[in-house]
């Protein structure tokens, strides 16, 4: 019994000992211990003569770029004391002095590739650089900061290569051994071979059964099958290139290809030549080849008697021994369907590589498509211009997709077309403005886009041309049936139907202007004197001058709208009595300034608010005749209406005296028939013209007629206070501030302010003159062309732009001015 107890105790002690040993063994890091021992030994060697060994010693244990770790350990047992992390751009560790000191200079990189040796790399220390080498068949990869195996196909063209000892170790056994492979360099694997692909990648492949790889021809060759077989022995061997009437037999211990007699085929089941159709014994789906077809064709049986010819990109034979098509059509233009095909993009302006297709034996093994989306596609300059060219985001360069620059993109043309966004005037400016290709890199640099655009264009007006060819930038006279330049609207060409010749050149002088919607392109306005002409010579300022206004102070002419309106109002509001009995209007009371500024005054009449009384007599009045003696009465008779005054006592005091008027009585109510004072004459003097311009195209004309008569001023006030409005035009009632103003309010309702016999009215047009998609801008393209029509909260107002109060939605129109609006283009 005691022996059993002792045995059990012994086993227990052994188990405990094993556990303790394993714990110590597995926890103990022999490599780390050896490193610390080496550090301690090195320190002792270099400093023991000067310093005693410290209790704690530090050393740099790990480095990652500019960050390093200092590990401190006890020198008596080499156990870790503590670890600290540091940045070598701030401080460096002096191993011998065992202290830190400030970094004297910043080290750009601790690890760098060697410029002359891909197998080497450079380590930068605090005081010097050390060149290190990777193992053989390795190169240093700076991106990974490590040594990586060399690609076996780096220096080999696409094709098949024998598998030597090094390739076998590295690619098959995944072993990178540091040994001398030159001893067995002549040896190769019999069936395995290396296949280098066109994209630089590789695969390890093996020859079929009964085949051996021939390094001399770089192909798999069939092993001899006729060893020990008699002549005439037919082999059950059918190579891919064997025709339907051919078979393989032995002759002198070698296999040779034989043919069946004419009109015979070789039956591979009967293993003999038969006189029959190739499909007779095999049926539908069987495939075969003949001598009269191409290398990429084969016949496929439809039934026992018919077959069809199949043409492929590449003909192969599958595992069932039947022919089939393989390959990608994109590889068809490559020799043997193997190689690299770089995709090139070419347009009128640029040429660049957009990607790469890599094929091997007519199969696509890799394809790279770079992101060639247009970096300019969403750019709109000056809110209306876009570039009719594309610059890619990426291009294919040196085997990868990289950002596109003018260094890897070829420029084919120094200019490119520019297109403007659609506008309400249907104006196409592609012949007026051409872009310079030098603009593109400046735009990509992020400069002010609008300024960069405007400074890098060519204008037709700058070269004295009506238009420019959008592609070649050459001057042209026609593009279609008419050609004009809205940036220089002084002329236009009427062309033939085919657009190959000029029928007539129009020149717009004073009184005429370019009207784009008229067939003859000519509009007339007696006041217009090319006020919309742009005088800038700087292209940036010209292209920015899309909307501006010209104000002109001039005289009212006898035939213009001011004369017509005020003449009509004067006739209507001039009266002889309080009952507004109108007098026949006479032009002798109307004074219109002709082109020379001549002021014409009326005859001597009493004006309203005059302070000079009437004369006692009129020396030019008709003389009266005395009926008694037929003599003319004197112009002035001092005794007329006189009485003889006699004193009561007589004497010299008697005399003639004037007849005294009756006593002054209170004023009585004037008789309704009492004539009104004569009214002031109609004076037509000044007017303001406001021309709205779309570049050099006059779009709207606002006329401000000055009123210089009290009658007209009162009439204007009366008209504005008594405006009539059609029910459907109630939202547009404020159009009355400007006559002939128009607003489209939606739902087929177009309203216009008019002056008629009844006064000023805002009426609904039977058919709207214009229908706008954008009610707020009163346009179709979202541009506010008419600056004198304003929209707010569903209400419409016509008001000169300089008098409009947007906050209060109010028109601060003057009492002595009447406004009239003309649309000069429609």
From Swiss-Prot:
Top-level lineage group: Viruses
GO cellular component terms, semicolon-separated: extracellular region; virion component
Disulfide bond residue pairs: 207-220, 260-273
Zinc finger (C2HC BV-type): 147-196
Compositional bias per record (Acidic residues), positions renumbered to this chain: 668-677
Principal place of residence: virion
Region spans: Disordered: 651-679
Signal peptide: 1-18
InterPro entries: BaculoV_Vp91_N (IPR013682), Chitin-bd_dom (IPR002557), Chitin-bd_dom_sf (IPR036508)
Domain spans labelled Chitin-binding type-2: 223-281
Molecular function via GO: chitin binding; zinc ion binding
Keywords of the record: Chitin-binding, Disulfide bond, Glycoprotein, Metal-binding, Repeat, Signal, Virion, Zinc, Zinc-finger
Glycosylation positions in this chain: 210, 333, 371, 413, 510, 520, 609, 722
Keyword Cell membrane: no
Cellular localization per UniProt: Virion
Biological function: Probable capsid-associated protein.
Protein's UniProt name: Capsid-associated protein Vp91
């Amino acid at each position: 019994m005691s022996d059993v107890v002792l045995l059990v105790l012994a086993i227990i002690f052994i188990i405990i000992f094993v556990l303790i040993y394993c714990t110590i063994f597995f926890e103990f890091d022999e490599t780390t211990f050896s490193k610390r021992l080496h550090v301690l030994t090195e320190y002792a060697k270099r400093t023991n003569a000067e310093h005693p060994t410290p209790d704690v010693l530090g050393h740099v244990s790990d480095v990652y770029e500019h960050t390093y770790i200092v590990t401190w350990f006890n020198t008596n047992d080499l156990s870790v004391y503590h670890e600290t992390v540091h940045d070598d751009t701030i401080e460096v560790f002096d191993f011998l002095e065992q202290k830190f000191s400030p970094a004297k200079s910043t080290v750009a990189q601790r690890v760098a590739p060697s410029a002359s040796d891909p197998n080497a790399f450079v380590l930068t220390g605090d005081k010097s650089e050390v060149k290190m080498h990777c193992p053989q068949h390795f190169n240093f990869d700076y991106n990974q900061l490590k040594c990586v195996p060399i690609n076996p196909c780096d220096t080999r063209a696409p094709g098949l290569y024998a598998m030597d000892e090094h390739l076998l170790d590295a690619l098959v056994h995944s072993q990178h051994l540091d040994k001398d492979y030159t001893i067995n360099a002549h040896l190769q694997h019999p069936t395995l071979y290396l296949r280098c692909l066109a994209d630089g990648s590789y695969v390890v492949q093996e020859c079929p059964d009964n085949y051996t790889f021939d390094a001399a021809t770089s192909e798999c060759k069939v092993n001899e099958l006729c060893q020990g077989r008699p002549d005439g022995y037919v082999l059950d061997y059918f190579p891919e290139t064997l025709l339907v009437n051919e078979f393989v037999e032995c002759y002198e211990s070698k296999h040779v290809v034989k043919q069946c007699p004419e009109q015979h085929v070789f039956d591979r089941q009967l293993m003999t030549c038969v006189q029959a159709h190739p499909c007779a014994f095999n049926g539908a789906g069987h495939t075969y080849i003949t001598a009269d077809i191409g290398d990429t064709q084969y016949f496929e049986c439809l039934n026992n008697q018919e077959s069809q010819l199949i043409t492929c990109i590449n003909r192969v034979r599958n595992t069932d021994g039947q022919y089939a098509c393989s390959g990608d059509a994109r590889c068809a233009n490559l020799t043997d369907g193997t190689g690299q095909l770089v995709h090139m993009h070419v347009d009128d302006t640029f040429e660049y590589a957009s990607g790469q297709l890599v094929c091997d034996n007519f199969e696509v093994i890799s394809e790279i498509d770079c992101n060639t989306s247009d970096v300019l596609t969403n750019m709109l300059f000056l809110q209306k211009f876009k570039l009719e060219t594309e610059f890619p985001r990426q291009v294919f360069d040196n085997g990868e997709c990289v950002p596109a620059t003018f260094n890897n993109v070829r420029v084919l043309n120094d200019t490119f077309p520019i297109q403007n966004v659609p506008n309400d005037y249907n104006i196409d400016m592609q012949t007026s403005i051409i872009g310079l290709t030098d603009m593109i890199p400046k735009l990509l640099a992020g400069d002010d886009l609008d300024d960069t655009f405007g400074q890098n264009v060519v204008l037709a007006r700058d070269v004295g041309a009506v238009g420019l060819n959008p592609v070649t930038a050459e001057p042209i006279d026609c593009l279609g049936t008419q050609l004009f330049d809205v940036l220089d609207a002084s002329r236009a060409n009427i062309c033939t139907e085919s657009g190959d010749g000029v029928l007539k050149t129009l020149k717009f002088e004073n009184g005429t202007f370019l009207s784009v919607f008229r067939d003859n392109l000519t509009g007339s306005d007696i006041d217009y004197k090319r006020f919309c002409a742009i005088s800038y010579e700087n292209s940036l300022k010209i292209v920015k001058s899309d909307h501006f206004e010209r104000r002109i102070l001039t005289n009212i002419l006898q035939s213009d709208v001011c004369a017509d309106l005020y003449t009509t109002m004067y006739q209507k509001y001039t009266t002889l009595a309080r009952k507004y009995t109108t007098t026949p209007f006479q032009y002798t009371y109307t004074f219109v300034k002709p082109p020379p500024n001549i002021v014409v005054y009326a005859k001597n009449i009493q004006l309203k608010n005059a302070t000079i009384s009437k004369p006692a007599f009129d020396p030019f009045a008709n003389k009266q005749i005395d009926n008694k003696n037929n003599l003319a009465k004197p112009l002035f008779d001092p005794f007329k209406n006189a009485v003889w005054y006699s004193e009561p006592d007589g004497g010299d005091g008697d005399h003639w005296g004037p007849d005294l008027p009756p006593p002054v009585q209170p004023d009585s109510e004037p008789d309704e028939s009492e004539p009104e004072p004569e009214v002031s004459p109609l004076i037509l003097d000044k007017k303001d013209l406001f021309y709205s311009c779309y570049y050099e195209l006059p779009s709207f004309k606002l006329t401000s007629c000055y009123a210089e008569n009290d009658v007209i001023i009162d009439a204007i006030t009366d008209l504005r206070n008594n405006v009539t409005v059609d029910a459907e035009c109630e939202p547009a009632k404020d159009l009355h501030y400007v006559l002939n103003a128009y607003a489209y309010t939606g739902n087929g309702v177009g309203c216009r302010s008019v002056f008629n016999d009844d006064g000023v009215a805002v009426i609904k047009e039977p058919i709207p003159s214009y229908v706008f998609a954008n009610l707020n801008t009163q346009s179709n393209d979202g541009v506010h062309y008419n600056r004198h029509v304003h929209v707010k909260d569903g209400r419409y107002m016509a008001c000169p732009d300089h008098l409009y109060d947007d906050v209060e939605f109010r028109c601060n129109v003057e009492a002595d001015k009447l406004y009239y609006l003309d649309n000069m283009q429609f």
